Amino acid sequence: MIQEQTMLNVADNSGARRVMCIKVLGGSHRRYAGVGDIIKITIKEAIPRGKVKKGDVLKAVVVRTKKGVRRPDGSVIRFDGNACVLLNNNSEQPIGTRIFGPVTRELRSEKFMKIISLAPEVL
């Protein structure tokens, strides 16, 4: 459950460390984003010589949340923190070339197959 002003970790090697959600995309008064939703973010903390820098405004897809994901069989998959993968603003393809940590099966849509293939573990 990600909303505006939520701080997230970054689960790729784009160079960003911490980002803040500034808008949940999809719908005019949409309040929350879950796993697989696209959000607009600004970079709050970045490493030197990364692909992105502090202050950049980009899109990102949420890959892990503390709230978790409920499956049709009733099971819930939760994580220790909120994490996202940065996307190119135009093509919505990942900026990084590696993904760190597990991602959920809910990302298996046409748009995010690249993230699924880069992830070390799909839950």
Swiss-Prot record:
Protein encoded by which gene: rplN
Q: What is this protein called?
A: Large ribosomal subunit protein uL14
Q: How does it assemble?
A: Part of the 50S ribosomal subunit. Forms a cluster with proteins L3 and L19. Forms two bridges to the 30S subunit in the 70S ribosome, contacting the 16S rRNA. In pre-50S ribosomal subunits interacts with RsfS, which may inhibit association with the 30S subunit.
Q: Which family does it belong to?
A: Belongs to the universal ribosomal protein uL14 family.
Q: Which domain of life is it from?
A: Bacteria
Outcome of mutating S117A, per the record? Answer: No change in RsfS binding
Please name the GO terms that the record assigns under molecular function.
large ribosomal subunit rRNA binding; structural constituent of ribosome
> What is one GO biological process annotated to this record?
cytoplasmic translation
Going by the UniProt record, its keywords in alphabetical order are: Ribonucleoprotein, Ribosomal protein, RNA-binding, rRNA-binding
Q: Does the keyword Ribosomal protein apply?
A: yes
Lineage of the source organism? Bacteria, Pseudomonadati, Pseudomonadota, Gammaproteobacteria, Enterobacterales
The effect of R98A is:
Reduced RsfS binding
User: Which purpose does this protein serve, as stated in its record?
Assistant: Binds to 23S rRNA. Forms part of two intersubunit bridges in the 70S ribosome.
Among PANTHER family, the record links this protein to: 50S/60S RIBOSOMAL PROTEIN L14/L23 (PTHR11761), LARGE RIBOSOMAL SUBUNIT PROTEIN UL14M (PTHR11761:SF3)
Q: Which organism is it from?
A: Escherichia coli (strain K12)
Question: Changing K114A: what effect?
Answer: Reduced RsfS binding
Q: Which InterPro entries does this UniProt record tie to the protein?
A: Ribosomal_uL14, Ribosomal_uL14_bac-type, Ribosomal_uL14_CS, Ribosomal_uL14_sf
Q: Name one GO cellular component term.
A: cytoplasm
